[in-house]
From Swiss-Prot:
Belongs to the IF-1 family. It is found in: Cytoplasm. It comes from Pelobacter propionicus (strain DSM 2379 / NBRC 103807 / OttBd1). Component of the 30S ribosomal translation pre-initiation complex which assembles on the 30S ribosome in the order IF-2 and IF-3, IF-1 and N-formylmethionyl-tRNA(fMet); mRNA recruitment can occur at any time during PIC assembly. It comes from the Bacteria. One of the essential components for the initiation of protein synthesis. Stabilizes the binding of IF-2 and IF-3 on the 30S subunit to which N-formylmethionyl-tRNA(fMet) subsequently binds. Helps modulate mRNA selection, yielding the 30S pre-initiation complex (PIC). Upon addition of the 50S ribosomal subunit IF-1, IF-2 and IF-3 are released leaving the mature 70S translation initiation complex. The gene is infA. InterPro entries: NA-bd_OB-fold, RNA-binding_domain_S1_IF1, S1_domain, TIF_IF1. GO terms for cellular component: cytosol. It holds the Pfam family eIF-1a. Keywords: Cytoplasm, Initiation factor, Protein biosynthesis, RNA-binding, rRNA-binding. GO terms for molecular function: ribosome binding; rRNA binding; translation initiation factor activity. This is Translation initiation factor IF-1.
């Protein structure tokens, strides 16, 4: 269990990177590096550039995150 709660923010996928990593532009115009969460990887949910996603950011490192949801 983490000591601090994750910060959830909305963003748009800018570019796909190798190993299921993505560059995501957040609503506040910051660019973060994000990877796909385990359940999204397990169920083969595809993420393409331009998709709206929900990203969880750790309060310790705000430049990296985990994509937890892809909006339709």
């Amino acid at each position: 269990m983490s000591k601090e709660e994750a910060i959830e923010v909305e963003g748009t996928v800018v570019e796909p990177l190798p190993n299921a990593m993505f560059r995501v532009k957040l609503e506040n115009d910051h660019i973060v590096l994000a990877h796909i969460s385990g359940k999204m990887r397990k169920y083969f949910i595809k993420i393409l550039p331009g998709d709206k996603v929900t990203v969880e950011l750790s309060p310790y490192d705000l430049s990296r995150g985990r994509i937890t949801y892809r909006a339709k």
